[in-house]
A protein has these predicted regions:
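C-terminal cap/substrate-recognition subdomain and adjoining C-terminal extension
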Residues: 71-167
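Short, exposed beta-strand "edge-strand" segments with a Pro/Gly-rich flavor and a Y/T-containing core
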Residues: 1, 64, 149-153
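Alpha-helical hydrophobic/aromatic positions enriched in membrane-embedded helices and signal peptides
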Residues: 1-3, 123-124
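Alpha-helical substrate-recognition element adjacent to the catalytic core
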Residues: 3-96
């Protein structure tokens, strides 16, 4: 059986501008103890991806700095679909000079994903990266799904993720 991984960002993917604006316009809370509340429509699309592919989730969002346990606690508290197995490492340090290291800051997530795959994935693993920013390595482009931060994961994007993960 082929291992499948979903590298998942939150802001602009599950936490959408549309849903935040909707909650604010209704005078309802748009945050809980974990942060911004995720858009139920985006969560439903995530559920479709997980149900169809059985992919494990690796968090690439800046929320990862809260730690893996905090991410897993939030997943359980919010009854989110799938299983968060890890967070990507932080390979870009604030003390680094990106220019001196030949690293483009816009590719930092891509470097972290590449490092995670090297350290953890078995050969021939399938993966997708879902993010609202182009923050990947060129070699990861075939695995990349770019969301509109206002809409997050849509039906069309979920279908693409399913096709990529299921081959």
């Amino acid at each position: 059986m082929v291992d499948k991984y979903l590298f998942l960002d939150f802001d602009g993917v599950l936490n959408t501008g549309f849903y935040r604006d909707l909650l604010i316009s209704k005078g309802e809370p748009w945050r809980d103890e974990h942060g911004p509340i995720f858009d139920p429509q985006a969560v439903e699309q995530l559920k479709r991806i997980i149900d169809a592919t059985h992919a494990d989730i690796v968090i690439v969002s800046s929320w990862k700095y809260l730690g893996l346990e905090a991410m897993q606690d939030m997943w359980a508290t919010r009854h989110l679909p799938g299983r968060v197995i890890d967070i990507t490492p932080s390979v870009v340090s604030a003390s680094w000079s990106l220019d001196e290291n030949g690293i483009d800051a816009r590719q930092s997530k891509g470097i972290e994903i590449d490092f995670w795959l090297f350290e953890n994935a078995v050969q021939d693993a399938r993966y997708v990266i879902i993010d609202d920013e182009y923050v990947i390595l060129d070699s990861q482009l075939p695995h990349f799904i770019l969301t509109n931060p206002f809409d997050g994961i849509t039906d069309l994007l979920a279908n693409r993720a399913i096709a990529l993960l299921n081959g």
